[in-house]
């Protein structure tokens, strides 16, 4: 079984479907943990109706889509910030595809894309309950750092030099 990773326009049907799956999962996990219920359908509809970000389009960044046996199974975004720093964002692998190496491949592909944008380091933030993501980042050499933003949902911040 094989994985492939390739750039994808953020406004494509594939990207939109993966964004819906990503947002639904991380939002539901947050609300179930902190409020005891899933995301309110109106909030979900409002968030998903926003136009795709241009920050994940060249030359500012890139959205990458992972396909398993040709079927879309995950995504990751990379966006260039100031001072040769790139941010890794929206890393997602469909639950049925987890444990097959797709997350690692997406992150490594995003790092490679960041290098082509002349980034010398990569940063990210994540939540405490996203334990799978934190384990992946640590296994790939990311180090936890003090906060680099004030995102209300961020609870852990990581960085990695891009050699």
What are these regions (language model features)?
Residues 53, 97, 120-121:
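Short, contiguous strand/loop micro-motifs
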Residues 107, 114-125:
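Conserved GNAT acetyl-CoA-binding A-motif
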Residues 13, 100, 131:
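Loop/helix-junction capping segments adjacent to catalytic residues or to phosphate/diphosphate-binding pockets
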């Amino acid at each position: 079984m094989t994985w492939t990773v390739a750039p994808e326009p953020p406004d494509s049907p594939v990207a939109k479907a993966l964004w819906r799956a990503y947002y639904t999962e991380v939002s539901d996990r947050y609300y179930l943990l902190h409020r005891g219920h899933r995301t309110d359908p109106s909030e979900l509809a409002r968030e998903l109706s926003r136009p795709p970000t241009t920050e994940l389009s060249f030359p500012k960044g890139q959205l990458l889509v992972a396909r398993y046996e040709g079927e879309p199974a995950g995504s990751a975004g990379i966006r260039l910030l100031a001072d040769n720093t790139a941010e890794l964002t929206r890393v997602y692998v469909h639950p049925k595809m987890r444990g097959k190496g797709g997350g690692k491949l997406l992150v490594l592909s995003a790092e490679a894309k960041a290098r082509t944008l002349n980034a010398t380091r990569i940063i990210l933030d994540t939540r405490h309950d996203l334990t799978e993501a934190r384990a992946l980042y640590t296994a790939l050499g990311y180090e936890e750092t003090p906060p680099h933003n004030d995102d209300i949902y961020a609870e852990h911040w990581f960085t990695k030099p891009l050699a």
